[in-house]
Amino acid sequence: MTTDLSSLATRIQRLEDRTAIVDTVIRYATAIDRGDWNAFASTLTDPVHIDFSEAGLPAADFARDDFVGFARQGLEVWTARQHISPNHVVTFDDAAPGRSSTAHCQSYLYAQHYHPDAAGVFLMRGWYDHTMVRTADGWAIAALTQHISWVEGDRNAPTT
């Protein structure tokens, strides 16, 4: 039995890329929850295309720092946040098999926001579509579309 090492190397590279993409998506979510805005920024390209139109924010290209500031301002009013992003489906744009420079990752969205003065929690459920690009520092989110299936609670945190 012979082993095609180039094919094996390609398959290993694909697994490494998939793992790095999923890790980037998870770091995006956990950085939000921890308020680690430098880590959050490191998951994004500059500029980054954001489409949160289903939540009321029209799709637009943002300078990375502008989007980080926007996210920080909107999320830090909540005392606690939990963003869960499971069920990752990664597909690659195979211009160069085994060394793709772009990929797509779809993941579920479960975002819970808590404030002690709110009447309950604010929950969002749906999914994300991430367009990922390979950069000198690894994979990063170049475009993000948020799809909302349903929400519960009041999206406006008390401003006490």
Where are each of the predicted segments found?
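A beta-strand edge to alpha-helix "cap/lid" segment located at domain peripheries
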Residues: T2-A9, E76-T160
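Charge-dense, low-complexity intrinsically disordered segments
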Residues: R11, L15, P58-D61, A119
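Short, low-complexity N-terminal intrinsically disordered segments enriched in polar/charged residues
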Residues: M1-T30, R34-N38, S42
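Intrinsically disordered, low-complexity regions enriched in Ser/Pro/Gly/Gln/His and often acidic
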Residues: T30-A31, A71, T131
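A solvent-exposed, acidic/Ser-Thr-rich amphipathic alpha-helical stretch
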Residues: W37-L109
